[in-house]
């Protein structure tokens, strides 16, 4: 049995559970517990804080984790990304007061930057030869310049609305993040097989999004005409019907063409 760590609450938690269910992995979270077991697939779900998930996977407390790539970059240690899941998109960016001119990265020399991601920020600054003071803040990073705690911030940005409401502007996009599936890399053969099954199911869910199953009954003498105009992922399936001279045409098509 595999143990998968996911975020205990929040949008990423709900989207992770939705993906698991779409992949046929049913999890009862009506009485959200620390640990729950799937009724349809040999996995346990471990609910943790998002910043604890990489460490839990690295230490073998969980076999896999679903977490934002930003957390892997900040705290990942010895874990590897085995699948990108296509939801929870955001970025980690540098932002400054909107009234300030921004000439480039030299702006940050000698400045105080508030962040919850000191490791990522430190690496970025060192790579670009910038000398700044990093102030680590656990939450509400965006208010730091307003209250005089910093000159700039380095924080998660989704739509940018929070920055605008706090009088800030985004000037450098450093890390692009989304939900990823991570592994510690020390899985048994049995667990590796389960991981491959999960990845196959997740991929099938992604491929099916935006698709519709199209079925039509058609006279046999019009099959070739229909095949020419019906879009398909590959080639439509044609099956004979009980009524002579008629067939059933099946195809998977993009929802946008219907």
Model regions and ranges:
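Small-molecule-sensing regulatory modules
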Residues: 1-42, 69-80, 85-91, 98-258
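Short glycine- and Lys/Arg-enriched binding-loop motifs that mark or flank ligand-binding interfaces
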Residues: 56, 61-64, 106, 163
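Short beta-strand and adjacent tight-turn residues that come in two discontinuous sequence segments
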Residues: 48, 62, 66-67, 154-157
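Short, structured active-site "lid" loops
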Residues: 42-61
């Amino acid at each position: 049995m595999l143990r998968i760590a996911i975020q205990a609450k929040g949008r990423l938690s709900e989207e992770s559970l939705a993906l698991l269910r779409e992949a046929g992995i049913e999890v009862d979270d009506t009485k959200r517990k620390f640990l729950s077991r799937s009724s349809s697939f040999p996995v346990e779900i471990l609910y943790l804080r998002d910043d604890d998930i990489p460490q839990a996977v690295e230490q073998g407390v969980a076999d896999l984790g679903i977490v934002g790539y930003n957390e892997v970059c900040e705290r990942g240690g010895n874990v590897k990304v085995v699948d990108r899941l296509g939801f929870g998109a955001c970025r980690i960016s540098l932002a400054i007061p909107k009234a300030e001119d921004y000439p480039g990265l030299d702006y940050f020399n000698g400045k105080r930057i508030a962040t919850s991601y000191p490791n990522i920020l430190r690496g970025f600054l060192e790579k670009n030869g910038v000398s700044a003071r990093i102030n680590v803040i656990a939450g509400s990073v965006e208010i730091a310049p307003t209250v005089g705690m910093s000159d700039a911030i380095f924080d998660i940005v989704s739509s940018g609305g929070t920055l605008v409401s706090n009088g800030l502007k985004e000037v450098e996009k450093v890390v692009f993040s989304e939900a990823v599936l991570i592994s510690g890399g020390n899985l048994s053969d049995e667990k590796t097989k389960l991981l491959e099954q999960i990845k196959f199911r997740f991929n099938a869910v992604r491929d099916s999004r935006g698709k519709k199953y199209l079925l039509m009954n058609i006279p046999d003498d019009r099959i070739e005409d229909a095949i020419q105009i019906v879009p398909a992922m590959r080639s439509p399936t044609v099956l004979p019907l009980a009524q002579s001279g008629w067939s059933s045409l099946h195809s998977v098509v993009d929802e946008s063409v219907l």
